[in-house]
Amino acid sequence: MTNIRKTHPLMKIVNSSFIDLPAPSNISSWWNFGSLLGICLIAQILTGLFLAMHYTSDTMTAFSSVTHICRDVNYGWLIRYLHANGASMFFICLFLHVGRGLYYGSYMYLETWNIGVLLLFAVMATAFMGYVLPWGQMSFWGATVITNLLSAIPYIGTNLVEWIWGGFSVDKATLTRFFAFHFILPFIVAALAGVHLLFLHETGSNNPSGLNSDTDKIPFHPYYTIKDILGALIMISTLSSLVLFSPDMLGDPDNYIPANPLNTPPHIKPEWYFLFAYAILRSIPNKLGGVLALVLSILILMIIPLLHTAKQRSMMFRPMSQCMFWILVADLFTLTWIGGQPVEYPFVVIGQLASVFYFLIILFIMPVTSMIENQLLKW
C-alpha cells in the first residue's frame, strides 16, 4: 500500500514541499530565513487577529483602545508587544534573506526573485499602515508625511493624496481604510509567499557554491526540518527576550502621546526598518526626485539579475565582490543611522554621500568588479 502522504490530493502537496522535497546537501544556515519568515507571518497574522478583536479604528478611540488592550485585556500587553516587535523580527529576517540572495546569486531564479521583491514591497506597505493604527503622534505625522509624498506626482498628485486621505487631511476616513488594508494585506502576502515557493520548487534551491546540485540531493525531512526548528527556537528566544525585557527599545516614545494635528514632533521618523530608505528620500532636496530615489532604492533589486556580469553565480569564490558586498552592507547601516538623525550638518552630507554610494555600488562598482574577476580567472 502506498503511503497516504504520497497519494492524498492535499497531503501530496505538503509532502512534495516540506517532506520529500529534494534539497542540496550543503545549504547553510543562511537558507533558514525562508522558514523563519513563514513563522513570522503566521505569528503576525495570529497576534494581529487578536488585536483586531479589541481595536477600534476611530480617531476618537483608537489610542484609548490600544491602551485598553495593554491594561485590561488578558495578556493584551503581550499580544501587542509580540505584534510590534514581531514586525521588527520580520524585517530582520527579510533583510538577511535578501542579503543571502544577493551574496549567493539566488536572484538568477528570475520569477522567484521578482515575486520576492513584490513581497518586500507588500510587507513594507503593511508595516507602514500598521504603524499608523495606534494613532500616536508619530503614527499621525508619519502618515501625513509619507502619504504627502504622492503629491509630488505631476498633475494628479494632489487629487491622489486627497483620495487616499478621504478628505483634506489625515483623519477618521484615513485611519479606517488603513485598518482595512492592514488587515487584508498579510493574507495577500501569504498568497504571494505560496507563489514564491511554487516558483522556487520549479528550479530547486540554490546552494552556497552556486553550482548545480542535482547530483547530490537529500530529503528536506528530517535534515532541514530539524535545522529549521533550531533556527526557529533561536528567533523565538530573541523575540521573547525583546518583548519581555525591553518591548519599547525599537519604538518611538512620541507614539505614547495621542495624535495632535496642531503639534508637530521635533523629529518625524519612521520605524527603524524604513530608516535607510527615509535617509535616501531626505538626501535629495527636490520632492519628486526624493520620491523617485525612495522607490528606486527598493525597485533596484528587480534589475540586479541584469547587472550580473560574473562567470560564477555565487560570491563564495569571488573575494573582490565579497568586499564590495560588505561595503554595501556597511553603507546600508550608515543610511539607517542617518535616517534617525536630525536634518542638519554633517548628517545631511553623510546621507547624500551614502545615498550616492548605495546606487553607485549596485549599478556600477559591483558589475565592474565582477568583470575584473572574470579577467583574473584567466591568469
From Swiss-Prot:
CDD domains: cytochrome_b_C, Cytochrome_b_N. A ubiquinone binds at H201. Heme b b566 binds at H97, H196. It is found in: Mitochondrion inner membrane. Keywords: Electron transport, Heme, Iron, Membrane, Metal-binding, Mitochondrion, Mitochondrion inner membrane, Respiratory chain, Transmembrane, Transmembrane helix, Transport, Ubiquinone. Gene3D superfamilies: Cytochrome Bc1 Complex, Chain C (1.20.810.10). One of its GO terms (cellular component) is mitochondrial inner membrane. The keyword Cell membrane does not apply. Binds 2 heme b groups non-covalently. One of its GO terms (molecular function) is metal ion binding. Heme b b562 binds at H83, H182. The keyword Signal does not apply. It is a multi-pass membrane protein. The cytochrome bc1 complex contains 11 subunits: 3 respiratory subunits (MT-CYB, CYC1 and UQCRFS1), 2 core proteins (UQCRC1 and UQCRC2) and 6 low-molecular weight proteins (UQCRH/QCR6, UQCRB/QCR7, UQCRQ/QCR8, UQCR10/QCR9, UQCR11/QCR10 and a cleavage product of UQCRFS1). This cytochrome bc1 complex then forms a dimer. This is Cytochrome b. The gene is MT-CYB.
